[in-house]
């Protein structure tokens, strides 16, 4: 772990006036972790509390909380699915790269990828950042994203690795090189961790120094788009995001099976309830093309069922992603298909570029909600 982050964590003070819910949930058992374990129900990531802009909380009673923008982020797109195992995280990673590649801005686009899957984070593996080191802290005690393939990323997975003492008291099990340390938390801890990942990350890009009447100042630029990889289902994480953050649009990923489409419909209904606009549906694993007969085979059911579901929901079909080995192989190697050049993945890249262009078009036609900014 970086010396700066460890020192900051070890020297943090939270006062003695917290309620019983804010007491540390566990104590570290070895070495320097004994003094560094400062996590609590109110601060599950253990980030020092000198931030003048605390994350908003969801009130237990009364009116719903006011949605706000994430500081340092212009627009937000969430990638979700009702059913697990449909390739949502892989799509999210490749969508972020597609947005980077298909931008029509006059300068290189600034894209971020946030992993909100607390129990099953995939972004570190997919983006080739498993061994990239620990996130540093900014001067405002915010987590600094790790970057690869031109995309800034943040995930709780960066804080669970063997080398990271940021989670010294996560469980009674010793972390190991297989990176299989579990997050064993109840709902309150999960929701607080989500709030910290949303509002305690510094997404801005430093742009050097500028001279003015007030002297020399350091400049920074916001992300153009933050892609958020959601966990499957319609639970606490989705509800927290929908209540706290002004999201610009959502993409629902599904496969053609009835069981996946049923849950995809539930995901759309949930986003409608929390007033998150729908960009469209994306069909993943739509077909497999045999090398011998060159005929596409719909292994998981007819894509016509997916198209009918989209029609019933009055949503656009953003694309159809085929089942290609290079997608999973690239994800395992930390090289998403969008940064590969293999001929096998060209059909996928073309489909994802089209999706990226559609999302850019959607975002360019939206007016930013008139809400405050937190973080």
Q: Predicted regions: what is each one?
A:
Residues 1-21:
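N-terminal chloroplast transit peptides
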Residues 3-5, 21, 25-61, 268-375:
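C-terminal lobe/tail of nucleotide-utilizing enzymes
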Residues 68-74:
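Phosphate-binding P-loop
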Residues 73, 84, 114-115, 123, ...:
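Residue-level signature of catalytic and energy-coupling elements of molecular machines
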Residues 75-118, 139, 268:
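Walker A/P-loop phosphate-binding motif and the immediately C-terminal alpha-helix
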Residues 107-185, 191, 214-221:
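Phosphate-binding loop that captures ATP/GTP phosphates
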Residues 118-120, 159-161, 175-177, 232-234, ...:
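Conserved nucleotide-binding/hydrolysis micro-motifs of P-loop NTPases
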Residues 199-205, 221, 225, 237-259:
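Inter-motif core of Ras-like GTPase G domains
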């Amino acid at each position: 772990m970086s010396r700066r982050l460890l020192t900051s964590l070890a020297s943090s003070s939270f006062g003695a006036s917290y309620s019983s819910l804010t007491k540390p949930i566990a104590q570290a058992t070895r070495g320097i972790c004994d003094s560094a374990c400062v996590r609590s129900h109110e601060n599950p990531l253990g980030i020092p509390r000198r931030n003048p802009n605390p994350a908003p909380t969801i009130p237990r009673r009364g009116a719903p909380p006011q949605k706000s923008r994430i500081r340092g982020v212009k627009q937000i797109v969430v990638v979700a699915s009702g059913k697990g195992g449909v390739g949502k995280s892989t799509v999210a990673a490749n969508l972020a790269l597609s947005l980077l590649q298909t931008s029509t801005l006059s300068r290189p686009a600034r894209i971020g990828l946030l992993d909100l899957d607390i129990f099953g984070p995939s972004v570190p593996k997919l983006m080739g950042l498993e061994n990239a080191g620990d996130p540093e802290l900014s001067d405002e005690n915010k987590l600094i994203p790790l970057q690869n393939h031109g995309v800034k990323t943040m995930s709780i997975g960066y804080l669970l690795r063997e080398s990271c003492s940021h989670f010294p008291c996560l469980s009674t099990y010793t972390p190991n090189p297989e990176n299989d340390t579990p997050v064993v938390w109840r709902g309150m801890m999960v929701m607080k961790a989500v709030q910290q990942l949303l509002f305690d990350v510094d997404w801005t890009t430093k742009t050097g120094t500028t001279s003015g009447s007030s002297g020399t100042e350091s400049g920074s630029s916001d992300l153009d788009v933050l892609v958020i990889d959601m966990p499957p289902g319609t639970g606490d994480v989705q509800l927290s995001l929908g209540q706290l953050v002004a999201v610009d649009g959502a993409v629902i990923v599904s496969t053609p099976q009835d069981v996946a489409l049923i849950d995809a419909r539930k995901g759309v209904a949930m986003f409608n309830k929390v007033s998150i606009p729908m960009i469209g549906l994306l069909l993943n694993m739509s077909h497999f093309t045999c090398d011998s007969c060159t005929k596409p085979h719909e292994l998981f059911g007819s894509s016509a069922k997916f198209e009918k579901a989209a029609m019933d929901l009055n949503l656009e079909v953003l694309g159809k992603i085929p089942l290609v080995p290079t997608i999973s192989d690239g994800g395992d190697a930390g090289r998403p298909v969008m940064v590969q050049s293999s001929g096998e993945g060209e059909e996928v890249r073309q489909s994802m570029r089209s999706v990226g262009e559609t999302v850019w078009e959607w975002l360019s036609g939206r007016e930013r909600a008139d809400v405050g900014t937190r973080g």
